Amino acid sequence: MYQTTAALRSAFLEFFRSNGHQVVDSSSLVPGNDPTLLFTNAGMNQFKDVFLGMDKRSYTRATTAQRCVRAGGKHNDLDNVGYTARHHTFFEMLGNFSFGDYFKEDAIRFGWTFLTEVLMLPKERLCVTIYQTDDEAFEIWNKKIGVAAENIIRIGDNKGAPYASDNFWQMGDTGPCGPCTEIFYDHGDHIWGGRPGSPEEDGDRFIEIWNIVFMQYNRQASGEMLPLPKPSVDTGMGIERIAAIMQGVHSNYEIDIFRALIAKAAEIIGVADLSNKSLRVIADHIRSCAFLVADGVMPSNEGRGYVLRRIIRRAVRHGNKLGATEAFFYKLVPTLIDVMGDAAKGLAETQVIVEKALKAEEEQFARTLERGLGILDSALNELQGDTLDGETVFKLYDTYGFPVDLTADVCRERNIIVDEAGFEAAMAEQRSRAQAAGNFGADYNAALKIDAETAFCGYSELTGNAKVTALYLNGESVPAINTGDDAVVVLDVTPFYAESGGQVGDKGVLMAQGIEFTVNDTQKFGQASGHKGTLTAGSLSVGQVLEAKVDKKLRHRTQLNHSVTHLLHAALRQVLGTHVTQKGSLVDPERLRFDFSHFEAVKPFELKQVEELVNTQIRRNHELKVAEMAIDEAKEKGAMALFGEKYDSQVRVVTMGDFSIELCGGTHVGRTGDIGLFKITSEGGIAAGVRRIEAVTGAAAMAYVAQQQAELEEAASLLKADAHSVVTKLKVQLDKMKQLEKEMQQLKDKLAAAASADLAGDAVVVNGVNVLIKKLEGVEAGALRGLQDELKQKLKSAIIVLGVAQEGKVNLIAGVSNDLIAKIKAGELVAMVATQVGGKGGGRPDMAQAGGSQPENLDAALSQVLPWITERLA
C-alpha cells in the first residue's frame, strides 16, 4: 500500500497530523539559526532553539520530512557513497517532535503503531535497543507494547566514557541530552550480521530504521545530569531505509527514486550495466547538488560552496569513467523533480537556475579533467608501493581542481592509499607563502591590541567633543605625541565610522586650541575605534578633549555608494535569482565594488535590467528606515544576513521601501533619491562562481556618463558620422576590414607557397628522411603554419623545424609527417628547441608550435635539432 517513497512520506506526515502534530515544511539545507553547522543534517536542526528554551512555537507537537546533507565537516558520508548500500550525501529524515508535551510512552507507542499497524511490518522482524539504565523505556516496551524481553537490548557506554553510547544522545559537552531507543529491522538470516550489541552488529542483517531520543537531562560542565523541567522528544527515520524495506529490496539504491535516477543517468551516458557503482554515485550526488543549489549554495572555493563543488566534480569524474563525452549531470534534474514529488516543490521553482549552475560547473571542470586524470594515471602507473605522495595530490588539487577526496576515490579503485598528511603539509606551505606575500608591507597598527571601548555617535552627528583615552606610536602605547608623529588616537566617543562591513573608515580632523590631528583612516581594534593619521600641529596627551570633525563630503559620497549597494544586491537577486549572495564588498567615496555568487558571466541585457531596476528605486525616493530588533525577528522579516558574519542578539536593520531589507551597521542616505544616479562601470569574474560589479553614483555617475558621451562623439567624428549613426558606420568599416584581411591572407598564402618551393631545396636527407631546419627572415609568425603545410606536401616524408625572431620574441613550428611520428613527435621536438630560447610549447604529434623570449639564442637552438633528429632516426 505504501510502497513508493512519495506514498511513505505522505503516510508518515498524515499519521502524525492525525495525532495532533503540526506538519512543518522541511527547512533549508543551509541552517538559518546555527552558524556552527555547515548543512542541515538532522530533523531537529530547525527546532534547536525550541529544545534549548530560546524559542517558542505555536505548537508543542511537530512532524517533518526534512531534507539533509552529510558531506564535509564532522558528518561526512562522501567517501562511502556508491560503495555501500546505505551511505548518501543527501537523505530525507522523517521525524516527530514533542516540545515538553508527550514523552517516552507516547513516543514509543507512536513509532510502534506506525510501523506495525500503518506499514504492517511483521512484529517478529523488529527488535529494539535502549540505554543500559533506562528501565522506564524497558517497562514501556515490554509491559505496554508487548515486545519480548529478549528483543529489548540494553546498550551501555560503548564509546569509552560515561554516557558515551550509541543509545545516549548529547547536543554537546553541556546542555540537553538523554537516552534513546532505536528500532531495528531484521532482513533475515540469508544476510550476514548480528543483533545490535553483538560482535557481528556491523553486518547488514539488522538495520536501524527509527531513533527516538528522550531529552530529559541538562548536562552541567561538571558532568552532573539535572532533570529538564519539560522533557522533550526528537525522533528520526531515514525514508530511504524504510522505503527499501517496504519495496522488498536490501540496498537503498534499489528503491524507486534511485532506480529512476540510475536508469536516466545510464540512458544519457549510454551505459547498459545498471549495477555499475558509478551510476549509484551519480544518482546520489544529483540529489544533494540540485537541492543545495536550490537552497542558494553555489559552487565556490570556500565553505559550503566548496563542498558542493567537490560533490559535483566527483559525479562528473564518475560520468567520465563511464564514457560521458559531454555535460550530462544537469540533465538529471527533471527526473529528480519528478521522482521527489511534493518534496521537490522548491527545486521545481528554481529548476532553470539549478540546471545552469550544474552545467556551468561541469563544463568548467571538464576542461581540466582529462589532463588531470592523465597525470594521475601516469603517477599511479609509475608508483613504487601502495601510497600516492602528497605533492602529486596537491598538484592535482592546485593545478587541475581535483579535490583530495576525488583523487582518493580514483586511488581507492586501484587499492592505492593517499598520503593525506603530505597533502596537508603542501597545503600548509602554500598558505604560508600566500600569507607572507599578503603581509608584505603590512601596517604595524594591524597588530595593535587596544583594551578600551569607543562609543559611536556618527549615525546622527558628524562633529562632537571627545576625550583621548589612548595614544599609540610605532605600535606602542604612549602618554603623548608631538608634531609630525604618525599615530593612532583612541577616543571615548566618536562620530568617525570605523571600517566595517565593506565601508571604509572615515577621514577628517581632530582639533583643539593649537592642536590639529589629520585623520587618514579609522579602524576597529576590538571594541575601540582607532583614528589613524598625523599630528600636524601642537602636541597631544591622553586625557585631553578634542573636537572630532568628519569630512562631510567624503562621508556623504560613501553613504551614496553604501545605500546603493543594498539596492544592487536586491536587484541582482530579482534579475538573476535568489541564489545570489554577497561574497564581499568595498564602499568608498569614489566607487563601490560588489562581489556575489553566480555561476556565469552576467549577460549585457541582465546588467541593463539590474541598472534600470536600481535607478527605478532611486527615483521612487524611498525613505531609509533603520530599526534595532532581535536577530530572529529580523530574519522573519526577510532581512538579508551574510554567511560567516557574527551578529549580536540585537541587530540593526536597514529597509528601503519593500525592495530591500538587510542587516547593516553602516551609514546611509536619508532617502534613495539622494543617490541621484547609479551606473555600472564593469562586470567580471574574480574566482570560480564569484562575479564582481563595480559602479559609481551621484556626481561620479554623471561624470562617467559625460565621459562616455564625449568618447562617443569623438568616435563619431573619426567615422565622419553623428552619434546616432556610429554603429552603422562602424559595421561598414569592419566589413571592409574583414574583406581586406581575407585578401591579404590569400596573398600571404601565395607567398608562402612560393617560398616553400625555394625552401624545399634546402632539405637534407638523414637515414632516408627529408629534414628541413630553417631560420626565416621577413616572415610573419602567422604565416608559419601555412608554410609548414606547404613544405609537408612538397617533401612528403619529412621533419620540418622553422623559426622566426622578431620584436624580441621567437616563434617556432615543428612538423612531422604521419609515417614518422612513431619515432619523432612534433610536440617533443618543438619543446626541446623552445627550452633553449626561454620558452615552452607543445601540440599534436604531427604539428606543434612554441614561443620564446630569447631571440639571440635561436641560431644555437636550431643547430641542436639535426643531432637530436639523427639520434632518433638511427
Curated annotation (Swiss-Prot):
Substrates-to-products reaction catalysed: tRNA(Ala) + L-alanine + ATP = L-alanyl-tRNA(Ala) + AMP + diphosphate
The protein's name in its UniProt record: Alanine--tRNA ligase
Keywords: Aminoacyl-tRNA synthetase, ATP-binding, Cytoplasm, Ligase, Metal-binding, Nucleotide-binding, Protein biosynthesis, RNA-binding, tRNA-binding, Zinc
Domain notes: Consists of three domains; the N-terminal catalytic domain, the editing domain and the C-terminal C-Ala domain. The editing domain removes incorrectly charged amino acids, while the C-Ala domain, along with tRNA(Ala), serves as a bridge to cooperatively bring together the editing and aminoacylation centers thus stimulating deacylation of misacylated tRNAs.
Organism: Shewanella oneidensis (strain ATCC 700550 / JCM 31522 / CIP 106686 / LMG 19005 / NCIMB 14063 / MR-1)
HAMAP family for this protein: Ala_tRNA_synth_B
Subcellular location(s) per record: Cytoplasm
UniProt cofactor(s): Zn(2+)
Superkingdom, taxonomy of origin: Bacteria
Free-text function comment from the UniProt entry: Catalyzes the attachment of alanine to tRNA(Ala) in a two-step reaction: alanine is first activated by ATP to form Ala-AMP and then transferred to the acceptor end of tRNA(Ala). Also edits incorrectly charged Ser-tRNA(Ala) and Gly-tRNA(Ala) via its editing domain.
Binding residues annotated for Zn(2+), in chain numbering: H562, H566, C664, H668
SMART domains found in the cross-reference section: tRNA_SAD (SM00863)
Alphabetized PROSITE patterns for the sequence: AA_TRNA_LIGASE_II_ALA (PS50860)
